[in-house]
Regions:
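Short hydrophobic targeting helices and cationic amphipathic motifs
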Residues: 4-6
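Residues at the beta-strand->loop junction immediately N-terminal to the Walker
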Residues: 27
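Non-catalytic interfacial helical region
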Residues: 16-24, 32-168
């Protein structure tokens, strides 16, 4: 068995090869700790594999923009990444930043991108493919900042790690 142990102050995470969570939410206002934890999770999942083929990163704020506003990413790109097999490798990690922006829109909001993003992420969380791992990150400091149904599903089958300098 291979073990990776992260130790920083009072926080310890132990990950074994048999216990690689498909879904990870890493959040908090301690950006360095969030980034170090995410980097170590990615390194563990993609050990010996080329990152350029096996790692994709999306930003929720970019995904929520209309097509004319953003030439970078759109929700269809995320859906395609989710639905296609990894290329030239046996596994893929998809990182989605600003996870606090993924919320179910109110019925009269009229924001189609918000609805599409929520449905796509809900689909990912409810049925992650065998050869893919998903890491969600956020600078939010409270669990209430996230969509309740999404965070509940991550709690049931994934890893949630919070790094904050203070408690409210």
């Amino acid at each position: 068995k291979v073990y990776l142990i992260l130790i920083h102050r009072k926080n310890t995470i132990m990950i074994s090869e048999n216990n690689l969570h498909k879904l990870c939410l890493i959040y908090g206002n301690q950006k360095l700790l969030v980034d170090e934890t995410v980097d170590s999770i990615i390194k563990e999942r993609l050990e010996g594999r080329p990152y350029e083929w096996a790692l994709e990163r999306f930003y929720s704020d970019e995904l929520l923009k209309n097509k004319g506003e953003s030439g970078k990413q759109n929700i269809e790109d995320l859906l395609i990444s989710y639905e296609t097999l990894p290329m030239l490798t046996d596994r893929k990690v998809i990182r989605i930043d600003n996870f606090e922006l993924v919320k179910k829109p109110s019925k009269n909001s009229g924001n189609n991108n918000q609805h599409l993003l929520y449905e796509t992420v809900e689909k990912i969380i409810n049925n992650p493919p065998d050869n893919m791992w998903f890491i969600f990150t956020s600078a939010a400091t409270r669990e209430q900042d996230f969509s309740k149904p999404l965070i509940q599903n991550i709690k049931e089958s994934g890893l949630i790690k919070k790094f904050t300098a203070y408690e409210n």
